[in-house]
Every structure is written in C-alpha cells, then in structure tokens.
C-alpha cells in the first residue's frame, strides 16, 4: 500500500511538472554546491506568451501546480504565531530573548535627532564618527542613530545645546524589535543558536491568505536559500520570457543570481540592434530586507503580467529587465544566520575584528571623495576603488554586457531602505550638477507621483548628494555630511556607463520600524516598486506614464477578472494611468518651481 501511494505521488508530481513547466531548463551545479550560471545571457525565443496560459485554459490545474510546488519546497512548519508589533499584543521579555541577541543588542536604542542648521548636522556627524555610532538614515529633517543606552550621555555631551533636547527614542528596545522582525519565532530562535538555519524555516506555497497577496512567497521575508530555488522555478515555468543569469561570484564564493525578463524582437532587423535594458537591484546593504523582497515581487509581477496586461506585454517587448534581488549575497545570508543589522559585505579588511566594505561606496567614479578610512565604520569603502568584490563583479558584468553582448542600459533603479525618497545623481557632491538634471528631476517627480497615486505614500525627490539639512537652505551645499557619497552605484552607472536615468529609491518606511519593516509591508511596497517600473518604462517609450492600449486596430488581450489577476497586476491600472495623465501638468509646475 505504501509503495502504491509513493508511485501515485510521483505520477502526480510528474504530470504537474509537465503542465506547469513548459520548458524545464536544467541548471548545472558545480562540485562546491553552487549553481553554474552563465554570465552571458542568451536571447529569448520568439514565442507566444506561455507558462501562465495553462491556468487560463484548465483552471483545475492550479491545484495540481500548487501540489507540485509544495512537493518541491515543502509544507509550512508548525510554529507559534508571532505576535504583531506594535499594539497591545504581548511582546517577548528580555528573559525570553536568545542570549546571543541580548549580548549583541541588549540595551541598544535608536534615537531620532531633529536637525535644522548646518552646524547641527556637522556636530552630529562628527560626534557619531568619534563614538563609532551606526547612522541608520537621514533626510532633510532628521537623522536616526543606533547606540547603547549607556552611551547616550556621552553623545549628548558632544552636541550643541540645541540638539541635546531635540531627540526622541525611535526604538527604545532594539533587541526585541530585531527578534520580532524574523518570519517566525522558531526561525529567530534558530538564527541565534545555530548556523544551520535553513532547517528551521521551510517556505510553503499555500496557507491562509494575506490581504492583497495570493502567493505565500510574499507573506514573509525569505532567506537566500529559498530565493534562489524560487528564481530557478520562475525561469523554468516561464522560459519564453525569463532567464536566470549570474552576475558574478561573491567574496565568499556565492553566486549573485539575477532574472532577465523580456521578449526578443520578431523582426531580424530589430534583433541586430542593441537591446535596451533596465536594471533593478536590491540588497546592496544586507540589512535592508525590504529591498530584496521588492525586487522579487517586481520580478513576479512582470513575469506573470506578460500576455495579460497590454502595458506590461509591450514593455517586455521593448525592453529587457535585469532584476538582481541582492548584490550583497554574503551579507544577506549573514543577516539571517548571525546579525540581523549587518550592513556591509563579509570581506576581510586590514583590521581582523572589523570585516566588511560598503558596496555602495566601492564604485570607481569619484571614489576619493569618500573620506571614511575607519574599517569599523558602516560606510567604509575600502582602500581603493572596486576593492569590494561584489561591486567590482557587478561593474564588470555591466561593462561586458555593453561591450560584448549588444546591450544598451537605459535605466538603473537601485532599491534601498528606508526614508521614502527618490534620489538622482550626483551622490558624491552637491557642487556638480548632472548634465541631464532636468530630465532626471522630471522622471523622478513622476515616479514619486506614481507611488502616491497608487498607494497614497509620499516619496520626496532630491539629489542624492543632499545632506540632512542642505536642501532646506537656498545656496547652501553641504560639505560635512552625515554620510559621504563618493563611489556610489548610481553615479557610476550614470557617468561611467552612460545610463541616462539612474536612481536610488529608498523604500518604506519613514522610521517607525526602519530596517525592521514588518512583513505586512512586503506586498504594498512591492506594488509601489512595480508601479515605478511601469511609469519608468512608459516614460522611456515617450508616453510620460500615460500609455493607453490600442483597442480596435490590435487583437485584444483579455483582461481577467479580479480573482484571476496574477499577483502584481492591479485592476485599477487604467485608473492610475488616467490620474497620472491628469496630474502630469503638476509635474511641470513643480519643475518650474525648482528653477526659481
């Protein structure tokens, strides 16, 4: 009986794979356990949209596909439900927290300082550098700093009187907040007791639904050990328009995987032209988990919208999208296994006890403008340009694509967190304006409006060079900033590689949770990024984000009912476009205001 059940299960799995995966691509593995992915990306076959069509023709196959995926990934573990934060729900006491977590972050707090003058900004930056404090984030109004509660008097003693009372406790108990940020209490316990954490968390493909999401993959943050198989599955299930590629190898020997999404042109004359390509990257800084989940969400939305959404179908015919969930794969793994707030990569420095380089300060353009020479600093760029292995691999891959693979990069969107900002070059200095400043501002304002119209969230638009208060004071250019900006990725792609539209987008939130954004924000933030991509693509097509699908002259693409919409395809897509069209005049008014 047991043998018959096993045979039946195997047959179900085989049939499901045949229906769910139109062209399964074998991914070879090296002897060290890493996927052997070719950095040279093959062109896509010219086929009609597939992969998703099976679910439309035979809806019953949805159950069969889910069964197959559950067999591949496993069922959800039975763990206690994690209490929500904040609210009246009971939180774990210090006695319940893992000892290693308490040893590292017990007694740590996050303070927010309100800044109003250049002198205050400079004083806070110098004090934080003197005490080796972790500057979490800063904007035109505030700066968030992590430190031990016992060190607060020392910090205040280095600050002017105007700042000594201009702060508040953003996170009064950081250790508890970190513990709450893991997908499950069981996983958090395992993360601080054993390095073999993949056994403690097995992703499931079906459970109780989260509002606004039908896929459990986006109901929680996922570790790299889950993201890579998921990417491999996407490339197999939707092989007509998706390829899994490798950007390079990290310092610790891990692959840096990416998904290339797009459809090759049907006409031979078009196929010989350089392929216009847009990059969406996340995870430069390991602790910024929402940037990683937002890249995977955007990838899923693009992949499953092809053939269903006319706007997305056209974008994938006109552009390739390369989506890199995390450049900093070593650091990202480290945040799951050891230190949730680790920021840099895991590269060795000249100080044995201070590992890691800031990948977003390691690129070659204006690298020398970053004066941080302390290897223990969270912003340490290394001793030379491109010393950071992952930054070097990323840049080399991009150059190789343009020089040898007939690729023309037309856009670069680098996701970070937090503070809800859309930033454009230059990052290294406020004294130099980019040649295409007006175009960068115009598109940046449009991206922020696309987010506001779709979700109501406010994203500010500014030059990446602006310090904590420099944008407030006309004619003032900050030279002593909270964090030096030389060697940034957006500057290098813009200036060295000639990518005309290069942006850093700092995602949710504005500080209530900081890097520890609750899982309930994964889908809403992912939707914001997806709307950014749609507006970005339409803008490059010359449609200013208000493209309308042709009706009578083309064969219509049936729009499914709401319950059948793939994750990420918003029913109100046309409504959003109409509202963007109505408000496009506001963008011109904003640009005129900035010119005064």
Swiss-Prot record:
Entry binding sites for Zn(2+): 285, 288, 416
S-S pairs: 354-376
InterPro entries in alphabetical order: Peptidase_M14
Keyword field contains Cell wall biogenesis/degradation: yes
Residues holding substrate: 285-288, 343, 360-361, 417-418
Signal peptide location: 1-26
Residues glycosylated per entry: 114, 400
Pfam families documented for this protein: Peptidase_M14 (PF00246)
Residues of the propeptide: 27-190
Localization per record: Vacuole; Secreted
Span of domain Peptidase M14: 220-540
Cofactor: binding details: Binds 1 zinc ion per subunit.
Function (record text): Inactive carboxypeptidase that may play a role in cell wall organization and biogenesis.
Annotated family: Belongs to the peptidase M14 family.
The name this protein goes by in its record: Inactive metallocarboxypeptidase ecm14
Name of the encoding gene: ecm14
